[in-house]
């Protein structure tokens, strides 16, 4: 069994170099491909990818910069994949030498086609490349550990296991139905929860591979608005709130609606800033949803082109 590793990236050439260096240390017999999916980077991302030609079975794909389109970028990787399983990792993580093998082992051990997720621990400091698994586990723990345990055993009884599927670290067998990101999610947030939900609804259990951890190196200016908020930086929740309403509206599931509504009660439209903000007290959820639906309708005629329309280039 071999894996295709799909890496969406934008303007993080130095981080990408570190991740690719980690992948060089994997058992190369486990790697079918490493697909770098460039979301229109203006930096030297292409040159970094080129530098690993011959060291990794690397494929480079590029789409025009039309805003944050991580889902479209990952779909480029899916279309290129030749491995038995497709692994998704973000461009700002580091992995231990047995990372790919840990994902493959989890799939081999599963008696069914499964969604395999690994934890994402955090660090604010650089580390040796590749980091050891022990170093990763000793870093700031993934929030999901609290809910489903260090070994992930708690996910089996969880009513909404799809909510734990983060695109920074999960894998699925190639050819699994529903294995495609919804390209109507634009900007940061929830395209990964959506694909996790659809895969789960299609009958694929979500399981945890405890050894398949990644170490997320925190950016000075993170794209995640929740991390911005934690670090006292001005967060932008616009795409997250719109994507949450899109996620809720596309699925006729009471659990999804309740999950989204529970979250949206904390947001309000700041007309002075022209942005959605998280203000810390409960608001009229229906007003938030109605306003977001109006924004989504207004944007419907000007959505970014799909991955099929994007320019792609091979090394």
Regions found by a protein language model. Give the residues of each.
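Short, acidic, metal-binding catalytic loop of nucleotide-sugar glycosyltransferases
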Residues: 21-31
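Non-catalytic, C-terminal membrane-associated alpha-helical segments of glycosyltransferases
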Residues: 238-239, 256-315
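Short aromatic/hydrophobic "clamp" motif used to bind/position activated sugar donors
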Residues: 86
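Glycine-rich, basic loop-to-helix element that forms the pyrophosphate-binding segment
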Residues: 64-81
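Conserved donor NDP-sugar-binding/catalytic core segment of glycosyltransferases
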Residues: 98-138
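A conserved acidic beta->alpha catalytic loop
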Residues: 22, 38-47, 93-94
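Short, flexible, basic/aromatic active-site loop/helix in glycosyltransferases
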Residues: 137-162
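Acidic donor-binding loop at a coil-to-helix junction in glycosyltransferase catalytic cores
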Residues: 188-195
């Amino acid at each position: 069994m071999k894996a295709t590793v799909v890496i969406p990236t934008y303007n993080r050439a130095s981080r990408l170099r570190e991740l690719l260096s980690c992948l060089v240390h994997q058992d190369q017999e486990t790697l079918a491909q490493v697909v770098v999916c460039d979301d229109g980077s203006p930096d030297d991302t292409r040159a970094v990818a080129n530098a690993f030609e011959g060291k990794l079975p690397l494929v480079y794909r590029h789409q025009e910069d039309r805003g944050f389109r991580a889902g479209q970028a990952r779909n480029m990787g899916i279309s290129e994949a030749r491995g038995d399983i497709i692994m998704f990792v973000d461009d700002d993580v580091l992995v231990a030498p047995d990372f790919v093998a840990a994902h493959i082992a989890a799939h081999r051990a599963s008696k069914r086609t499964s969604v395999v997720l690994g934890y994402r621990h955090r660090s604010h400091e650089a580390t040796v490349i590749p980091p050891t698994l022990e170093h990763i586990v000793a870093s700031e723990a993934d929030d999901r550990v609290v809910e489903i345990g260090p070994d992930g055993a708690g996910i089996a009884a969880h009513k909404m296991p799809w909510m734990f599927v983060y695109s920074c670290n999960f894998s699925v067998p190639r050819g699994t139905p529903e294995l495609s990101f919804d390209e109507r999610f634009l900007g940061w947030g929830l395209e990964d929860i959506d694909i996790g939900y659809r895969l789960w609804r299609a009958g694929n259990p979500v399981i945890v591979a405890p050894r398949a951890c990644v170490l997320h190196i925190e950016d000075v200016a993170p794209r995640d608005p929740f991390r911005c908020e934690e670090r006292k930086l001005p967060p932008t929740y616009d795409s997250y709130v719109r994507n949450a309403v899109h996620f809720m509206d596309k699925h006729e599931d009471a659990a999804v609606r309740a999950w989204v509504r529970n979250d949206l009660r904390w947001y309000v439209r700041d007309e002075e800033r022209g942005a959605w903000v998280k203000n810390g007290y409960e608001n009229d959820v229906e007003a938030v949803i109605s306003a977001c639906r109006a924004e989504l309708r207004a944007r419907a005629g000007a959505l970014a082109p799909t991955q099929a329309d994007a320019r792609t280039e091979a090394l």
